Structures are given as C-alpha cells and as structure tokens.
C-alpha cells in the first residue's frame, strides 16, 4: 500500500509517498506563520492535490499533541496560531482515504522500532533529548497513544522537586533539567556566556562547570530510563535528539544507569534514523493499525 506521509514541524512541513519503507517524491516547504490556521488549510489542500491519486492512506506526524484529530500542546502558546487546529478534519476535506495522526516523537519511536525483532523486544521507548525532552512508548508491540494523545510526554515527569520551573508550569520536570534549553539557561549565564554546543565542547575538554552541567542532564535521563524500566518493564531504549546524540553524552547516560541495581538496566542505543523518522514512523504506524483493524480516530 502507498502512503502519503506528512511531517509537520514548527518551521517546515515534509511530505512524501512511502511504500514498503521507501521514500519517494519528497517535498519540503516552510510551515505557515502569518494567518497560520487559514494558511495551513490551504497548504494541506495543496499537498493533497500534489499527490492526488498516488496514495491509499494518509499518515501524519506533527509537533504538539494530537487529541482526537485536533492539534494542541501542553503549552498551547508554543503552537502560535495553530493551537486547536482541526488537523484531521482539514485533511479529510480533500480525501476519503484513511487518515492517521500522531505526534512527531511518537512517529520517531515507530521508525526506530519497526525493524526490531518484535519477539525479542516487546516494550520499547524512544527518548529525544533536544530543545525539549519527549518520548514514544511501545508496550506489547503497540504504540501507546490513547486516550488523549499525551502518552510519551516523559520529559514532564519529575527529575528534581527543587529544580527549575518547566515551561508546562510544573517544578522540576526532566525537561527543565536535562534539555538543551535547560543547559542553555545555565551556560548563558557564564562569563563568557556559552551556547549548549559550546558547553559540550568544554565538557569534552573536562571543564569543571561544563562537566557538572552535562552530568546533571545525563543523570536526569538515566533516572528517567530507570523509572521506565522499573515501571513498564522496558527492554530497550533508543536515544536521539541534538543533545542525546552529542559526542560523549550517551556513554555518560549509560554510566549513570549502570551504577544502579541491575533490575533498572536495559539496552540503551543511539537513534539510527534522521530527518525522515517522522515520515517513516507515521507511515509504518498507520499501516500497522490498518493491518490490525484498529480504528483511526
């Protein structure tokens, strides 16, 4: 079956036909900013017209939370004019094919999981450590999405009850301690100020301040992994994102995890898929849902 896959981000929208895990006719345009809702309706109409007659179903990976086909977020301000955008309804105006939607990190989790030995790995988590911290959770070989689309927002679990206030409003979330934005909040106050990239360069040179800062982030992610293992019996975790893939970061996470009792351990690996993870993962997930007879809300 041929899939029209879309990956809707804050700055770009990618689209392609995905057939048997192969991407064809990939296009990329800027995400509308001015008059965002009306412009997004027009953009989606144009994309559907471009690929008309070439697909059997539509799969969408999007930033934010997909709640019953509507785009929202823990902090709706992050979506600007697209908060509460009726994403599924907008697409359905232009096609009668099945439509499946999930958030971009859930889609990336599917991209990382799709080639796993499903008999060996039934419980799997993808964690992205980037500007923020997010995740996708697969339990008993099925992506956890229901009922309100928030499953996988593991960056908003607790890391430090006395830590910084997170953008979601809670104190001490993992994201507020471990994410690139959290690293920058500290390193930007140094003399001279540093970006997260520069902080990592100093970390690799054994700078004391930078090492403590990166260790704080890696320790929070290691504890998050341990919580997932003990709470959900997770067998494998894959880590991606600009921070998660930074040189020296994942070995540090593993080091902290290995210091814990063995029943908190699991396999931890680096993400393999890059910019097209959203397209590939969304296409795989919707195809699997259709194969299993799962209703796409």
Curated annotation (Swiss-Prot):
Q: Which GO terms describe its biological process?
A: N-acetylneuraminate catabolic process
Its EC number(s): 2.7.1.60
Q: Which organism is it from?
A: Pasteurella multocida (strain Pm70)
Give the CDD domains listed for this entry: ASKHA_NBD_ROK_EcNanK-like
Q: Does the keyword Nucleotide-binding apply?
A: yes
Q: Taxonomic lineage of this organism?
A: Bacteria, Pseudomonadati, Pseudomonadota, Gammaproteobacteria, Pasteurellales
Top-rank lineage group of the source organism: Bacteria
Molecular function terms from GO: ATP binding; N-acylmannosamine kinase activity; zinc ion binding
Pathway linked to the protein: Amino-sugar metabolism; N-acetylneuraminate degradation; D-fructose 6-phosphate from N-acetylneuraminate: step 2/5
- Gene expressing this chain: nanK
Function according to Swiss-Prot or TrEMBL: Catalyzes the phosphorylation of N-acetylmannosamine (ManNAc) to ManNAc-6-P.
Ligand binding (Zn(2+)): 156, 166, 168, 173
Keywords, A to Z?
ATP-binding, Carbohydrate metabolism, Kinase, Metal-binding, Nucleotide-binding, Transferase, Zinc
Could you give the subunit structure recorded for this chain?
Homodimer.
Name this protein carries in UniProt: N-acetylmannosamine kinase
> Which Pfam families does this UniProt record tie to the protein?
ROK
Per the similarity annotation, which family is this? Belongs to the ROK (NagC/XylR) family. NanK subfamily.
Q: Which reaction does it catalyse?
A: an N-acyl-D-mannosamine + ATP = an N-acyl-D-mannosamine 6-phosphate + ADP + H(+)
Q: Where does ATP bind?
A: 5-12, 132-139
């Amino acid at each position: 079956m041929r899939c029209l896959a879309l990956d809707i981000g804050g700055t770009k929208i990618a689209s392609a036909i995905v057939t048997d895990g192969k991407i064809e006719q990939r296009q990329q345009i800027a995400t509308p900013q001015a008059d965002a809702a009306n412009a997004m309706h027009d953009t989606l109409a144009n994309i559907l017209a471009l690929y008309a007659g070439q697909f059997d179903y539509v799969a969408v990976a999007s930033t934010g939370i997909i709640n019953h086909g509507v785009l929202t977020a823990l902090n709706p301000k992050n979506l600007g004019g697209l908060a509460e955008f009726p994403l599924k309804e907008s697409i359905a105006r232009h096609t009668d094919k099945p439509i499946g939607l999930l958030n971009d990190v859930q889609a990336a989790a599917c991209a990382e999981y799709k080639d796993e030995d499903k008999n060996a790995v039934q419980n799997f988590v993808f964690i992205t450590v980037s500007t923020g911290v997010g995740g996708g959770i697969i339990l008993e070989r099925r992506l956890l999405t229901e009922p309100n689309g928030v499953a996988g927002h593991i960056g908003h679990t607790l890391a430090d009850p006395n830590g910084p206030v997170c953008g979601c409003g809670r104190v001490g979330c993992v994201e507020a301690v471990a994410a690139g934005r959290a690293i920058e909040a500290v390193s930007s106050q140094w003399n001279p100020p540093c970006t997260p990239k520069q902080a990592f360069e100093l970390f690799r040179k054994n700078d004391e301040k930078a090492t403590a800062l990166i260790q704080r982030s890696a320790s929070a992610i290691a504890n998050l992994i341990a919580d997932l293992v003990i709470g959900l019996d997770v067998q494998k975790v894959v880590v991606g994102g600009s921070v998660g893939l930074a040189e020296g970061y994942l070995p540090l996470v593993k080091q902290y995890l290995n210091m814990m009792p063995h029943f908190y351990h699991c396999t931890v690996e680096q993400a393999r898929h890059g910019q097209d993870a959203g397209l590939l993962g969304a296409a795989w997930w919707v195809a699997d849902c259709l194969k299993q007879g799962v209703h796409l809300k």
